């Protein structure tokens, strides 16, 4: 769902884990911590599955969750969204700093399978509902959703 369109700037992807599917995730046969996307001065985490916060702290060099610019969820499955709430709490210093962005499909925000806690949402600068085939921009980083 996320395609990074990188301009002429330093950019990187850091995989905090590549584990997926319930049995791999439940047993942590491979880490399932999502992906750090950096472009210019922007740092986002995409699909923060189980252990993302811990994997950020243990990565080399460490990724300070409080310095993230936002979180991108592609869908509501637990292996892609489990740590979204703790990351929102971290990047807003428990709501003391009104900052950061959350990009998520409607299913992650509404209904019986919503994965983002309502009390955390006002802590963020903005909560953006992702739509198909739409381009989004965070300063130096631009990305486009697929179908």
Whereabouts are the PLM-identified features?
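Metallo-beta-lactamase
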Residues: 99-147
């Amino acid at each position: 769902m996320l395609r990074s369109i990188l301009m002429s700037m330093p950019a990187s992807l850091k995989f905090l884990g590549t584990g997926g599917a319930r049995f791999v995730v439940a047993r942590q046969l491979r880490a399932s911590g999502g992906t750090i996307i950096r472009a210019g001065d922007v740092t986002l985490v995409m699909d923060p599955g189980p252990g993302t916060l811990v994997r950020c702290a243990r990565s080399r060099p460490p990724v300070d969750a409080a310095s993230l610019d936002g979180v991108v969820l592609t869908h509501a499955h637990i292996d892609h969204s489990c740590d979204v709430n703790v990351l929102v709490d971290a990047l807003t210093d428990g709501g003391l700093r009104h900052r950061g962005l959350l990009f998520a499909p409607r299913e992650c925000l509404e209904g019986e399978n919503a994965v983002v806690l309502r009390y955390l949402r006002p802590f963020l600068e903005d909560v953006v509902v992702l739509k198909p085939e739409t381009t989004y921009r965070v300063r130096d980083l631009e990305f486009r959703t697929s179908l």
